[in-house]
Amino acid sequence: MSGYLNVKYNMSELNYEHVFNVLVDKTAEYVTSNNLKVMVLGISGGIDSTVVAAICHEVSKKTGIPLIGRSLPIKNKSDEFDVSKLVGEAFCDEFKVFNLSSSYKSVLFDLCADTGLIKDCKGYDWYWVSDLEELAGRTPIANGNIQARCRMIHLYDIASIRKGLVMSTDNQTEYQLGFWTIHGDVGDFGPIQDLWKTEVYGL
């Protein structure tokens, strides 16, 4: 582990309460020293965004800087949506759900047209999203990257208008494996970026 928690340790001996408090303090130090007005967080309902929401909630109580949360579903399963709503309402000073499925479809349609995958000149409304996703040459990774970037456009616009920053939810395991999207799910400041996935669960 590097960065905020620059100490040697055995995972079985890790004091997660101490780790949590250090992450809260370091995040609070960053947002206050940069005179930021809000923290913006995309909440998926997964463990990473939930832990970051909990950290930022404590930062908000400590600094008075509000946490703005958004659940931005694109073809999400109902159970993921339910969890994201619970997390957002529990930890955020302001929380909304905004469905980005139409934005995703619009971008996907334009990209398919640009690359020549759509050649019959049928209009946007003629296609289902699944039709576009399954055109020859498209892959689940490419489609997933578009979804992540659609969400970041939304979050960064909020941060820009309200003079804040977007919180990153990536952990060290994802970073080392390359399991993240450039200009997608990586934000401005990552409270859990030095934690391995197992440690995120421990936290």
Q: What are the functions of these language-model segments?
A:
Residues 184-202:
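Gly/Ser/Thr-rich active-site loops/lids in small-molecule metabolic enzymes
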